[in-house]
Design a protein with these regions (language model features):
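Structured catalytic-domain cores with a bias toward divalent-metal coordination
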Residues: 1-310
Length: 310
């Protein structure tokens, strides 16, 4: 779909619509909000290819890649900058609900938000760990909308079926925040080892399973969601582990690992092999995210750790 076309910029975005055989709600699924989170992109593409209208009640809108220019230019999110458009240097996930008279990224955000998200009943954003990230599989729902929207979003987050889910005060001007503020229940599925670039099947299938479960939850598909038997909720916020030395980072713990307080999780070494620093877990918890940097400076974020409620 063409959104902007002038002498300065042309913006296109792939949009797939599956109109079900029966009436029902409208669900919009977005991928590629951060364009190098490839597992979400691949999952969205496969769902458009494989989902049969005969099996659907309602309408499913699928955007495999919102930020097509960043996807084509392989613009990552990394330590110094969020993933940005090569057209105007802006991050799409920081300019919602957009501006029809703004820069190219703001025009794109305005179209996605007003013409697609606001005309839907529910929204799922498929994420996948960016090129610097190794993420545990989990779902995220906003905790800072009105009570009813928060409730429905949490129901969606649980219905994904993952072992872990998390409530979060999401950032203003992000897609999930602005959608939920407008009364559109909106969640994130986070599945992927972004640094591998070739998205692994387990993570792709986790996205697809989550969307399928949510469609069953809303009676858009027949059957009942398949839910992990022992779901756990992450606490809000992170315990961060940062480098205190300049050197080469050797990660020992990875996403999903269960940690004891004081456990060795990594080292920073010199080029002569000397150990400059040992990294230990500050909590009993779970590795939410490993930042897969090799060369690190003082202050670089290496781990986000979370605790489990209860």
């Amino acid at each position: 779909h063409n959104i902007l076309n002038n002498d300065a910029a042309r913006i296109d975005m792939p949009v797939g619509v599956i109109n079900g055989a029966k009436d029902g709600p409208t669900l919009i699924v977005t991928g590629g909000l951060f364009a190098t989170e490839f597992s979400g992109v691949e999952a969205a593409s496969r769902m458009y290819r494989d989902f049969d209208p005969k099996d659907i009640s309602g309408r499913l809108i699928i955007i495999p890649v919102i930020t097509l220019d960043a996807f084509q230019f392989r613009t990552p999110m990394f330590n110094l900058s969020s993933g940005v458009s090569p057209r105007d240097g802006k991050s799409l996930n920081g300019v919602f609900p957009g501006n029809k008279d703004g820069s190219p990224t703001e025009v794109l955000a305005h179209y996605v938000f007003n013409e697609l998200v606001m005309k839907s009943d529910y929204h799922i954003d498929l994420r996948g760990g960016d090129l610097s990230e190794s993420h545990v599989i989990h779902s995220i729902h906003p905790n800072n909308a009105d009570r009813e929207t928060n409730r429905i979003s949490e129901d969606m987050s649980r219905a994904c079926g993952f072992e872990y889910f998390q409530a979060r005060d999401v950032d203003p001007r992000s897609l999930v925040y602005e959608a939920s503020q407008a009364g559109i229940p909106s969640i994130i599925t986070q599945c992927g080892l972004g640094y591998k670039t070739q998205a692994e099947e387990d993570f792709i299938n986790s996205h697809i399973s989550a969307v399928t479960n949510i469609m069953k939850h809303f009676n858009m598909m027949a059957g009942s969601p398949i839910i992990h038997q022992n779901q756990k909720e992450f606490t809000v916020g992170f315990d961060q582990v940062r480098a205190k030395s300049f050197g080469t980072f050797q990660g020992i713990a990875d996403q999903g690992d269960i940690l004891k307080k004081g456990q060795l999780i990594g080292r920073v070494t010199g080029l002569d092999g000397s150990v400059l620093e040992e990294l230990h877990s500050p909590i009993n918890g779970v590795v939410h995210e490993l930042l897969v940097r090799r060369v690190v400076s003082q202050g670089d974020l290496l781990y986000n750790l979370v605790q489990i409620k209860g």
